[in-house]
UniProtKB/Swiss-Prot annotation:
The family this protein is said to belong to: Belongs to the glycosyltransferase 94 family.
Any one GO CC term of the record: plasma membrane
Enzyme Commission number(s) from the entry: 2.4.1.251
Record protein name field: GDP-mannose:glycolipid 4-beta-D-mannosyltransferase
Taxonomic lineage of the native organism: Bacteria, Pseudomonadati, Pseudomonadota, Gammaproteobacteria, Lysobacterales
Organism: Xanthomonas campestris pv. campestris
Keyword set, alphabetical order: Carbohydrate metabolism, Cell inner membrane, Cell membrane, Glycosyltransferase, Membrane, Signal, Transferase
């Protein structure tokens, strides 16, 4: 059953106060802006608390809201992983015994990496305890017992006060954490095969592995058109890098929800991405000329023709992101929490 997020947002006069424990740490300068903006958007009736295992095991709260639950189960060391998984099992027993509802946001259809049978078993247990799911795009399959649709918010306000660069003609950009599934190795190979002298490629982000770092550094050394900033970058730097490009290129091997795509659109930059049901829905939502979708292989023939296609495409001054405003998103999360508790969710609207 899917709850629509299309109702008008108003503040209820007597909204029930609830305490929500989030599975993430207290926001800081390095926190994912999606999370920071969500916490800021929650209405006053929601008292947020942030995760520590001690807090989760020993304190009282009305709802546990999980984002990326696999990260509660992982540690760089084997013993650390076992300890975290044992603590997580205790937490799940507590939730089951107390009847504390779990709300879970579906950022990915499945974790990007498989870390073994214990993690898989604990994630299945979490799934069984989840009272209400939040999907952040309307193409994600619904899950029982209830799934609410609350679209991923934009980053327009987040970057509004940050300096932006003058666009560099022909600049292509790939940014974000550099992981194998994002196809950066294919992008580098294709760029070397492209003969168009107008094009240059910029890679910005922190490599997930030493092998990924070496791959990008080697490509930069072999082709003067390719440059990179291989580090975690603060948002002001990211705003300048994104605004400097003509096109953001995301040749992901798999793509369902992408904060990177929405970040690029929030800074009014066109994006090239693989066709998927979710990407096609975003392309329709934001208007023509902003999201360019390809099917099949990502190759030199595709990339060679993109610059002229992007320049020729009619588009408005900015993509339409009105369905992704944060005040609305905060109220809709409050409604989900109330309904997970068996209360009237309309009190939130």
């Amino acid at each position: 059953m899917s709850a629509s997020a299309s109702l008008p947002v108003t503040r209820a006069a007597a909204a029930p106060r609830i305490t929500v424990l989030f599975s993430t740490e207290k926001p800081n300068a390095n926190t994912n802006p999606y999370l920071t903006q969500l916490y800021d958007a929650l209405p006053d009736a929601v008292q947020p608390r942030f995760f520590s295992m001690r807090e989760a095991l020993l304190s009282r709260y009305d709802v546990l809201h999980l984002h990326w639950p696999e990260y509660l189960l992982r540690h760089p060391s084997k013993m650390g992983t076992l300890a975290k998984q044992a603590c997580a099992a205790l937490l799940l027993m507590k939730l089951q015994l107390t009847g504390t509802p779990v709300v879970r946001t579906l950022h990915n259809l499945a974790p990007h990496e498989d870390r073994g049978w214990r993690e898989r078993a604990l994630l299945r247990w979490i799934d069984q305890l989840t009272r209400r799911w939040i999907r952040i795009n309307a193409t994600t399959p619904v899950r029982p017992p209830f799934t609410d649709t609350i679209l991923h918010g934009h980053y327009r306000d987040w970057f509004a006060t940050m300096e932006q660069s003058t666009t560099l003609p022909g600049r292509l950009l790939h940014f974000g954490l550099i992981r194998p599934y994002k196809g950066v190795e294919v992008l580098l190979d294709v760029m070397r095969d492209v003969q168009d002298p107008r094009l240059s490629l910029r890679i910005v982000g922190n490599p997930a592995t030493p092998x990924m770092r070496t791959l990008v550094e080697t490509a930069c050394a072999q082709d003067a058109r390719i440059s990179a900033l291989l580090a975690y970058v603060e948002e002001p730097v990211l705003a300048r890098e994104v605004s400097a490009c003509e096109l953001v290129v995301l040749p992901y091997k798999q793509m369902h929800n992408s904060g990177t795509l929405l970040l690029a659109l929030s800074l009014a930059r066109p994006v090239l991405a693989p066709w998927s049901e979710s990407n096609a829905a975003i392309a329709d939502e934001v208007g023509p000329g902003w999201v360019f979708l390809y099917e099949g292989e990502f190759d030199a023939a595709l990339l060679s023709g993109m610059l002229d296609q992007v320049r020729a495409a009619p588009r408005g001054p900015a993509p339409d992101l009105s369905q992704r405003d944060w005040p609305r998103i905060g109220q809709l999360h409050y409604r989900t929490y109330l309904e997970a508790l068996g209360k009237d969710g309309d009190a939130a609207l």
